[in-house]
Amino acid sequence: MATLDVLRFPDERLRKIATPIEKITSDLEHIIEDMFETMYLEEGIGLAATQVNIHKRLVVVDTSENRDQPMVFINPELIEKRGETGIEEGCLSVPECRAFVPRAEWIKVRALDRHGEPFEIEADGLLAICLQHEMDHLVGKLFVDYLSPLKRQRIRQKLEKLARNER
């Protein structure tokens, strides 16, 4: 296993729309393991392949307290949603920034598991929010896109300053 580099906003590669995964391969299994390792190391609860410059419809998630319930979503589709909620969200691609984002309170997602088997899951709470956030990445959307242009510009400036200080 290896850790992967997480793309940071405003990197334009985060805007690329992911393509469906056609075949489950050993290479895909390695990517999944590397994504989990990266997500856990970065202390995230979800990671979309787009964030690690792999533009395929793949999401890994673990919202459990003990980090022992890894979930894989290949070619996920949001097929139903209800209600409205939201929390202050963060993102591995937008470090040290948080903002309130409106989300559906309850969702149903259809996907393939890591073995290529189809499944559906109903989710609410943190899992529902996390899945919506990660699935946004697959279509080139970031949580900052829900914010006003002024707030988005402030975040961009903050991240540019952080990047300069890291050099």
Swiss-Prot record:
Its cofactor is Fe(2+). InterPro entries: Peptide_deformylase (IPR023635), Peptide_deformylase_sf (IPR036821). The keyword Protein biosynthesis applies. Binds 1 Fe(2+) ion. GO terms for molecular function: metal ion binding; peptide deformylase activity. The keyword Lyase does not apply. It comes from Tolumonas auensis (strain DSM 9187 / NBRC 110442 / TA 4). It catalyses: N-terminal N-formyl-L-methionyl-[peptide] + H2O = N-terminal L-methionyl-[peptide] + formate. The active site is at residue 134. This is Peptide deformylase. It is an enzyme of class 3 (hydrolase). HAMAP family: Pep_deformylase. Its EC number is 3.5.1.88. Fe cation binds at residues 91, 133, 137. Keywords: Hydrolase, Iron, Metal-binding, Protein biosynthesis. It holds the Pfam family Pep_deformylase. Removes the formyl group from the N-terminal Met of newly synthesized proteins. Requires at least a dipeptide for an efficient rate of reaction. N-terminal L-methionine is a prerequisite for activity but the enzyme has broad specificity at other positions.
